[in-house]
């Protein structure tokens, strides 16, 4: 049996924009598959024939071939994204009297047993790791760090092994796990307690994460982001609020954080194309979400496969480890249909021109809604108050997408 390029994922068909449907996309930048198609097809057919013509066997082979054939520009871009993970042995965070215990088994099993025993003996009432509860905070940190990196260094910035960028080192140090750093886990937890009633050791959702980011950004103007606008229950963005910011400073850097739930148990097919469009936008800084109580940081896609960094790998909480591990080419993939419907979408607007361009870009979005003002939001056939709709708990998102489309006159 002879296999075609289409069967093995090398079909160079074009989408509506004239771009290859097989391109890899990283935060708005397209990269072609960098491989010798004829050679890959030849090798694939040899493997397929020897396996009795199994396309499934071939696809496993192609996945391995593909690992060695990424476009160099794609790999450079991926490696330059910032990625944070679980950390161990950081400065202890005291537990709340009515909060989770640091000695819960699901926290302990993921840690080095010696670390777990040491903490149980010397700090039984403190957390010195975020294993089992901090993944949404870590992916929120990743989203924020990449937004800051772009705001300060530009989207074209790339990591160079032979040339350490001191400004980027400073950005990364802001996320070190110590109360003294502005975007540390400690300060996320502190804001989670103040703004979202989250106790140390409790899992954050998109709403708590976005509120913490907004408050921490406001307290640290040196981060390069002038304002952080949060929509915790939908992706509603209000023109009057954004326009007021640009009236005062035309070239403001605005980070938009939009919490959405695009289905019940899984993402509704109605939204799948728009998720790709969000990651394809040059204004995207990624999506935090993934699976129930298991957050991932999505930074790109290829076809129906999303590309992500997984924070669930514990590493020591030292500045040396942080600097060594925050850049990696070790990314994973998931089919878009397997994505959890609750997610936090990040968009960075660098000036009024970006705002106008992005507004036009999402005009027909099924997820993001640009409304004139909050007065345009009506809760038809719903007993919830406006305040409840705009500020739901993490597990009670309201999908206002179709309703807002009706307000905008969209089909």
From Swiss-Prot:
Active-site residues, as the UniProt record annotates them: 135 (nucleophile), 310, 312
Major location category of this protein: cytoplasm
Reaction catalysed by this enzyme: [protein]-C-terminal L-amino acid-glycyl-phosphatidylethanolamide + H2O = [protein]-C-terminal L-amino acid-glycine + a 1,2-diacyl-sn-glycero-3-phosphoethanolamine
Subcellular location: Cytoplasm; Nucleus; Preautophagosomal structure
Family, similarity comment: Belongs to the peptidase C54 family.
Role of this protein: Cysteine protease that plays a key role in cytoplasm to vacuole transport (Cvt) and autophagy by mediating both proteolytic activation and delipidation of ATG8. Required for selective autophagic degradation of the nucleus (nucleophagy) as well as for mitophagy which contributes to regulate mitochondrial quantity and quality by eliminating the mitochondria to a basal level to fulfill cellular energy requirements and preventing excess ROS production. The protease activity is required for proteolytic activation of ATG8: cleaves the C-terminal amino acid of ATG8 to reveal a C-terminal glycine.
Name of the protein in question: Probable cysteine protease ATG4
Native species: Vanderwaltozyma polyspora (strain ATCC 22028 / DSM 70294 / BCRC 21397 / CBS 2163 / NBRC 10782 / NRRL Y-8283 / UCD 57-17)
């Amino acid at each position: 049996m002879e296999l075609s390029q289409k069967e093995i994922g090398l079909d160079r068909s074009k989408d509506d924009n004239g771009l290859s449907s097989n391109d890899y996309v990283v935060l708005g930048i397209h990269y072609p598959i960098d491989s010798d198609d004829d050679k890959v097809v030849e090798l694939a057919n040899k493997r397929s024939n020897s396996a009795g013509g199994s396309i499934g066997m071939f696809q496993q082979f192609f996945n391995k071939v593909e690992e060695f054939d990424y476009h160099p520009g794609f790999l450079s871009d991926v490696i330059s994204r910032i990625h944070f993970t679980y950390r161990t042995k950081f400065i202890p965070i005291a537990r709340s009297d009515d909060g989770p215990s640091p000695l819960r088994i699901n926290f302990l099993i993921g840690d080095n047993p010696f670390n777990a025993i040491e903490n149980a003996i010397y700090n039984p009432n403190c957390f010195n790791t975020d294993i089992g509860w901090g993944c949404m905070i870590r992916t929120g940190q990743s989203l924020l760090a990449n937004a800051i990196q772009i705001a300060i260094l530009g989207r074209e910035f790339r990591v160079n092994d032979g040339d350490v960028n001191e400004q980027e080192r400073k950005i990364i140090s802001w996320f070190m796990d110590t109360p003294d750093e502005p975007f540390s886990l400690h300060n996320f937890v502190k804001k989670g307690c103040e703004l979202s009633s989250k106790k140390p050791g409790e899992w954050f959702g998109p709403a708590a994460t976005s509120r913490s980011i907004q408050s921490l950004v406001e307290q640290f103007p040196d981060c390069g982001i002038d304002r952080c606008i949060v929509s915790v229950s939908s992706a509603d963005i209000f023109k009057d609020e954004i326009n007021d910011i640009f009236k005062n400073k035309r070239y403001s850097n605005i980070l938009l954080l939009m919490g959405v739930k695009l289905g019940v148990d899984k993402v509704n097919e109605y939204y799948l194309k728009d998720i790709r469009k969000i990651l394809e936008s040059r204004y995207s800084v990624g999506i935090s979400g993934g699976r129930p109580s298991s957050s991932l940081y999505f930074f790109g896609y290829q076809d129906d496969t999303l590309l992500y960094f997984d924070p669930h790998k514990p590493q020591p909480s030292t500045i040396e480890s942080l600097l060594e591990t925050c850049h990696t080419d070790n990314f994973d993939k998931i089919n878009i249909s397997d994505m959890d419907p609750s997610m936090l979408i990040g968009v960075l607007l660098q000036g009024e021109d970006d705002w106008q361009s992005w507004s036009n870009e999402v005009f027909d979005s099924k997820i993001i809604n640009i409304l004139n003002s909050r007065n345009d939001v009506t809760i038809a056939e719903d007993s919830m108050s406006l305040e409840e709709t705009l500020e739901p708990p993490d597990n009670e998102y309201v999908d206002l997408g179709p309703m807002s489309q009706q307000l905008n006159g969209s089909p």
